[in-house]
Amino acid sequence: MKVTDVKIRKINGESRLRGVASIAFDDCFVVNDIRIIEGEKGIFIAMPSRKTTKGTFRDIAHPVNTETRQVIEESILTKYQDVLNNPVEDKPEQEN
């Protein structure tokens, strides 16, 4: 399985949440809402999760082995650094 697209939405604010990512595999499967979080030991990703009725959180989708997790994390964090280093200027609104 190959990562074919990564999209980052930067989050500005004072929380530890720095961004949200979507990642596509083989141009046919997408995982949305992967959080990019700043922790005490640096930036990491958190897979999408849902709060259970017992108040705990359970991943909706997650890699089943370390190698896949590393590929996902590296792809997202590399793209996140690209977004930080090359900010896209807001396009001015066009008048009609």
From Swiss-Prot:
The keyword Membrane does not apply. It comes from the Bacteria. GO terms for biological process: division septum assembly; sporulation resulting in formation of a cellular spore. SUPFAM superfamilies: SpoVG-like. InterPro entries: SpoVG (IPR007170), SpoVG_sf (IPR036751). Pfam families: SpoVG. The keyword Transcription does not apply. Keywords: Cell cycle, Cell division, Septation. Belongs to the SpoVG family. Could be involved in septation. HAMAP family: SpoVG (MF_00819). This is Putative septation protein SpoVG. It comes from Phytoplasma australiense.
